Regions:
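Membrane-interface interhelical linkers
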Residues: 1-70, 74-86, 134-149, 182-235
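Hydrophobic core positions of alpha-helical segments in small-molecule transporters
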Residues: 11, 35, 67, 94-97, ...
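Hydrophobic transmembrane alpha-helices of multi-pass small-molecule transport proteins
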Residues: 38-44, 104-107, 117-135
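Hydrophobic alpha-helical transmembrane segments in multi-pass integral membrane proteins
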Residues: 43-55, 102-118, 155-171, 220-235
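Short, charge-rich binding segments
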Residues: 80-85, 92-94, 107-108
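Transmembrane alpha-helical cores of Major Facilitator Superfamily
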Residues: 93, 97-100, 151, 182-185
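Small-residue-rich transmembrane alpha-helices that serve as helix-helix interface/gating elements
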Residues: 123, 178-185
Length: 235
């Protein structure tokens, strides 16, 4: 069973960087982020329909789902600002270092113990993160504000993951994902629109990328959905 969980988590970790990579490379990362959440919501609804699962079963854990959705809003605000101001290869490992945060919180407050294979997997992730961010003559401490934003993104994502892990003990992963995405997508759209460049048209700023790079938008959403679904299945 633990090997199955490790395989799900590892596959999820391999897929997940595609979302941030495509968002960072897109000339309009806010629009790409919004597109990803629209794709997630659609895929989750289709997945639930195919599986014959009632999306309204979320009422059993509505407070957890609402908190998770608000956490997603905060995560993307912190993460997008981090990727805009800092080097992606340096700060992505920090924003995605939530397994360490989860392990510490679970051990200290939830009394959870982890097996050797899971601890080994976390250690491998952080060894890889070190080599990703390492650059001779340069350090992440050179941008303290960006570093703080990256750490905040990591903490928020860790809290969201803990809430989602609790949620999928009651409902199916696609149900949780659908409502979390639906809760977050509209507030994020409003926030992105209010903070757009002064010379940017709101519709073009938020949705113009669907005309310019529809393939990358679909890739962002689909890869992230599969990644997060596998992670929730592991829980």
């Amino acid at each position: 069973m633990e090997l199955n969980i490790f395989a799900l988590a590892f596959t999820s970790a391999m897929l997940h960087p595609w979302r941030e990579f495509f968002i960072k490379q897109n000339k309009n990362p806010e629009g790409a982020c919004l597109a990803a959440m629209m794709v997630w919501t659609t895929l989750a609804a289709l997945h639930a329909f195919i599986e014959g699962i009632d999306l309204f079963s979320i009422q059993l854990i509505w407070p957890i789902t609402l908190a998770s959705g608000l956490g997603f809003i905060c995560f993307f605000i912190f993460a997008l600002r981090t990727y805009r101001d800092g080097d992606f290869s340096s700060y992505y490992p920090i924003t995605r270092a939530d397994p360490l945060f989860i392990a510490i919180i679970s051990f200290l407050f939830l009394g959870k113990l982890y097996s050797f294979i899971l601890i080994f997997g976390i250690i491998l992730v952080f060894i890889g993160a070190f080599f990703l961010q390492y650059r001779s003559g340069w350090g992440i401490l050179s941008q303290p504000k960006t570093l703080c934003l990256a750490i905040l993104a990591m903490i928020v994502h860790g809290m969201v993951t803990l809430m989602d892990a609790r949620a999928v003990q009651v409902v199916e992963p696609m149900v949780q994902f659908f409502w979390v995405s639906l809760i977050a997508v509209i507030p994020l759209g409003v926030i992105f629109a209010l903070n757009r460049p002064k010379d940017g048209h709101v519709f073009e700023y938020l949705f113009g990328g669907w005309r310019q790079t529809p393939g990358s938008f679909l890739m962002i959403g689909a890869s992230a959905y599969v990644s997060y679904f596998l992670m929730l299945k592991a829980f």
